Regions:
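Hydrophobic alpha-helical signal peptides and transmembrane signal-/tail-anchor segments
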Residues: 1-5
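C-terminal capping/extension of enzyme domains
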Residues: 9-10, 14-39, 43-44, 55-57, ...
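Short, conserved, surface-exposed binding loops centered on an aromatic residue
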Residues: 40, 102-105, 144-145
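N-terminal nucleotide-binding beta1-loop-alpha1 segment
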Residues: 49-52
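Short, surface-exposed acidic-centric catalytic microdomains
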Residues: 62-130
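Short secondary-structure capping/junction motifs at helix and strand boundaries
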Residues: 86-87, 149-150, 171-172
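Internal catalytic-core helix/loop-beta-alpha segment
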Residues: 109-166
């Protein structure tokens, strides 16, 4: 009975864990938005995905990274790791399976945050080109919390450019290529790289199957 009580307690904690940064949400005013999510940084993370900034909250279907139901990030991850683009999709509720996503990312060592901690939206949409960076993220502070990190992954032009500026990376990598991040090694002395992937946004003109192939190549490279 004690065992099942512990299981129920664990499930309850998993279901009620909040990834919202309530302090940042409260600070957001006069057109400046502070990042509404806390960094998701599993201690075993080898990959850190850095976007630009979450879309407006009205577009969210869950309180986590890549929350827009029409963004295909979680469909890509489902296809890469489980051969099923709908593995993390709850079609009836039109949302993603948050508990499954969190457990998966913790197991695989996949971390998430964004290259901007505070932004101003020049238009009321999710397009990166209408984001003004007010406060870039302290990327070095994130890296310091990820001793096994091998790659920072960006999937958009804005995020890539912001990261290159922040980390003094002299050349912006083309899509599906990577470059070393200067003076950045993990705890094993391995070079940390910036790997640029195609955007998971449906506005990016590439078939989902091609995006899946690109993401699979990246994960395969890091798992060698």
């Amino acid at each position: 009975m004690v065992f099942f009580s512990l299981i129920r307690t664990f499930v309850y904690m998993e279901q009620t864990t909040s990834y919202l940064n309530k302090e940042h949400i409260a600070r957001s005013h006069h057109g400046v938005e502070y990042h509404p999510l806390i960094p998701f940084l599993p201690a075993n993370a080898k990959v850190l995905f850095l976007g630009s900034f979450p879309p407006p909250h009205k577009r969210w279907c869950m309180d986590f990274y890549y929350p827009n139901f029409i963004n295909d990030h979680w469909r890509i991850e489902g296809a890469v790791f489980f051969g099923d683009r709908n593995y993390f999709v709850d079609e009836d509720a039109k949302c993603f399976k948050l508990a499954d996503i969190v457990a998966f990312c913790q197991e695989k060592g996949i971390a998430f945050f964004d290259t901007s901690t505070a932004i101003r939206r020049l238009q009321d949409n999710a397009s990166d080109k209408f984001l003004e960076v007010v406060e870039p993220t302290d990327i070095c502070a994130l890296i310091a919390r990820l001793p096994q990190l091998q790659a920072i992954v960006t999937t958009g032009e804005k995020a890539t450019e912001t990261l290159c500026t922040s980390m003094n990376i002299p050349s912006i990598p083309k899509v599906n290529t990577y470059v070393p991040i200067p003076n950045t090694l993990n705890s094993h002395g391995q070079q940390v790289v910036l790997y640029r992937l195609p955007s998971s946004s449906r506005a990016y003109p590439l078939a989902l199957e091609k995006k899946v192939e690109a993401y699979r190549r990246m994960f395969d490279l890091l798992n060698r």
